[in-house]
Amino acid sequence: LRGITPAMKAQAPREPPQTEAAPPQPGTDETAQIEAGGLQGDMGWGPGWSVLTQATFIEQFHYAFPSAYEGQNSFGSEAEAEHTFSFSLFLGRRLWEGGELFFDPEFFQGYGLSRTLGIAGFPNGEAVKAGFANLHYNTSRLFIREAFGFGGGKETLEADPRQFAGEEDVDRLVLSVGKFSANDFFDDNDYSHDPRTQFMNWALWESAAWDYPADIVGFSDGAVAEWNTRSSTWHYGIFMEPTESNGAREDYHLGKAHGQILQFDRRYIVGGRSGTTRWFAYWNQAHMGSYAVAAQQQDPEDIILTRSYRSKVGLGSSWNQELTESIGAFLRASWDDGRTESFTFTEVDRSVAGGLSIAGKSWRRPADTAGIAAVVNGLSANQRHYLEEGGTGLILGDGALSYSPEEILEAYYEFRPWHGLEFGPDFQYVRNPGYNSVRGPVSVYAVRAHVEF
């Protein structure tokens, strides 16, 4: 393991939406449960304070695999190993009744395999695209949360990095304004939304065709409004976009550079088992290149030359269902129009994913979790043609392309010897990495350790 130094981060790891308490992991007792979406508890700085922390280490490697050729943005075919590390401190302060301030300083270190290039469903959800040789500081979250109650009874919320523990009205409007990750509030899933403790593949913990607004480490300034009732939640968010693809600076031409998303969640119980369905639509505007325009220019391989203010639209849905006391299932599907360059997340225009989360109660380890899932990613005709011509994108570019959908299988096991400590192996099998049928398949092995308190 090269000495155990915990893991880093890719597009912001996700916590459950702050408007509802995350349901228990199947088969675990509430006192033993480690919440999949984040840290629980209060370190006790006194009334009105919340102090939580986490550290995650991931070591990944793969052996050499067959490859007809490689390009600038290929996943390397020679054997390699890399690690990532992240450390987060989540501070919360009650300002007044209903008002809360949150501050999240984080440190990242390490690299994804092949500099986080070459696989659209990248295998490490903690890998920042840039990567850092030394510890890199980032103010990941700094925002105010304000809740307005409208009756409907009371609901008990558990503490997590986005909310304080306590009671709030079931019917409530919650406004959050400041800096955070868009997927702190959107595209949640009980069994696959946190690469620090659940599935690590980008296309499993996120709807891969949602090109969510973010800087190079996965965060953005924005505002979110959430209307919660007992069985449903509406979410609306607007976020700033970067000045360029995978950029660090935000574009202040707000009238033509921003991302909007609208999501509806429906919670239900069937046969005594809880489930949730979610649907969302998004509309991004940014200084993006066009695949069609790139194909017509003298140098079709450089989409940067075609950048102008353009729009991208997309749709997504997810579902999670408790099947038994110990087994939960999830599905995800997402789509975007595929006309403009992949700008902030990854290069996927269509994606379908599904899997199972299995608590260890049946083998007398109720706090442990095993997971298995699969995902198939695809490209639009425009983006496929661009890569066939030798173009390079956000993370892909083999210099040529023999197109075939990217197919990925992931399995993991998380040991929880006591509350707050998790570790275990992860395996991913990637067929047609980067949508290229003449490369791969490749098997990626990992060990993950996670601490929270």
Regions found by a protein language model. Name each.
Residues 1-80, 90, 94-96, 100, ...:
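N-terminal periplasmic/intermembrane-space "pro-region" immediately following the signal or transit peptide
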Residues 39-51, 63-64, 92-101, 149-172, ...:
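Short loop/turn motifs that connect adjacent beta-strands in outer-membrane beta-barrel proteins
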Residues 49, 83-89, 138-144, 173, ...:
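Hydrophobic, lipid-facing positions within transmembrane beta-strands of outer-membrane proteins
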Residues 55-61, 103-107, 175-179, 236-240, ...:
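Transmembrane beta-barrel strands of outer-membrane/channel proteins
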Residues 93-95, 105, 146-148, 179, ...:
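Residue-level signature of outer-membrane beta-barrel architecture
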Residues 117-140, 151-263, 301, 390-401:
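Surface-exposed coil loops of outer-membrane beta-barrel proteins
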Residues 140-153, 372, 441-453:
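Outer-membrane beta-barrel "beta-signal"
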Residues 265, 280-309, 337, 341-430:
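Outer membrane beta-barrel transmembrane domains
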